[in-house]
């Protein structure tokens, strides 16, 4: 019900319903947090996450990946570092959605060394992991690094998606490597 209200952009009604619940489980917390995120209410989402922690509610993979994404989008470094600390404390970094959110967060902050280091230590990677790294390189003018990551992704057998191609082309255009970027489209 809460998530449905949020999907209809009735976040105030969703919050009222949530606040009037006698008991909240991790699912109701996650639905509310996720619903707020869908409506670009990141600050409210962070407030709700803090409330969740203060009330001693359980967190899970969905909670952490969602909150990390908000920290990335808001460029909320202090909050993001605190959430990252919780992720490590609870061992959630081993879960692919959380790991991908961490790479994306570091990349959006411009911390490409941290993004790359975390990426290298991930036990499992998928196209989202690789694409987050490639797009991060592109946003920060690191065209050669984006190309190397793209090539390595293909060598590992992961099939690039449209976002990976666009991220590579974007990276190349910002680094003056447009012809090299188009080469990825010709060979794939």
Regions found by a protein language model. Give the residues of each.
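Alpha-helical tandem repeat RNA-binding modules
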Residues: 1-188
């Amino acid at each position: 019900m809460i998530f449905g209200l949020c999907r209809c952009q009735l976040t105030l009604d969703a919050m009222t319903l949530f606040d009037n619940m006698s008991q909240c489980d991790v699912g109701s917390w996650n639905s509310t947090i996720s619903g707020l995120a869908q409506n670009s209410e990141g600050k409210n989402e962070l407030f709700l996450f803090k409330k969740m922690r203060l009330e001693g509610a359980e967190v899970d993979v969905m909670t952490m990946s969602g909150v990390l994404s908000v920290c990335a989008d808001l460029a909320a470094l202090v909050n993001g570092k605190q959430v990252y600390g919780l992720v490590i404390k609870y061992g959630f970094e081993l879960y692919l959605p959380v790991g991908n959110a961490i790479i994306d967060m570091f990349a959006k902050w411009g911390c490409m060394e941290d993004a790359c280091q975390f990426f290298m230590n991930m036990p499992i990677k998928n196209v989202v992991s690789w694409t987050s790294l490639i797009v991060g390189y592109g946003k920060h003018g690191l065209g050669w690094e984006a190309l190397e990551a793209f090539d390595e992704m293909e060598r590992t057998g992961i099939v690039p998606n449209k976002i990976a191609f666009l991220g590579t082309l974007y990276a190349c255009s910002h680094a003056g490597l447009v012809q090299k970027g188009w080469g990825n489209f010709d060979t794939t």
